[in-house]
């Protein structure tokens, strides 16, 4: 998708590489940097920003589960916000939310990109 940023490992030197496995859909304006690992068939919705310190919160169960640095296989991820207290008050900080698992309807929504690739069409 357009305007995607995928980081490398030039800065800082000790950083791990970004890993994006097979059949991942990366939506428009996503940024993935600082050694984040996106596992196979995950879907990153538009404007998701993932860094090594970004909280990725799975909200599909009864209680939220927080992880960092890794998007589990077949997860559907959207941008979100989380309240955080600071000395100057409470503010919203960015996070990513796992809202479900990839399914057939998700594949239909992302299939245009596959069709363009298969037919060697540049956009």
Protein language model regions, located:
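Terminal amphipathic alpha-helical/low-complexity segments used for targeting or macromolecular assembly
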Residues: 68-69, 73-75, 79-123
């Amino acid at each position: 998708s357009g305007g995607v940023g995928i980081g490398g490992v030039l800065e800082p030197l000790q950083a791990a590489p970004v890993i994006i496995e097979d059949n991942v859909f990366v939506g428009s304006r996503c940024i993935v940097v600082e050694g984040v690992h996106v596992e196979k068939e995950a879907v990153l919705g538009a404007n998701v920003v993932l860094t090594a310190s970004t909280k990725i919160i799975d909200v599909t169960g009864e209680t939220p589960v927080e992880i960092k640095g890794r998007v589990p296989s077949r997860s559907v991820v959207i941008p979100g916000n989380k309240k955080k207290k600071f000395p100057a008050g409470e503010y919203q900080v960015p996070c990513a939310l796992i809202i479900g698992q990839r399914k057939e309807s998700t594949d239909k929504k992302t299939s245009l990109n596959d069709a363009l690739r298969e037919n060697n069409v540049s956009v």
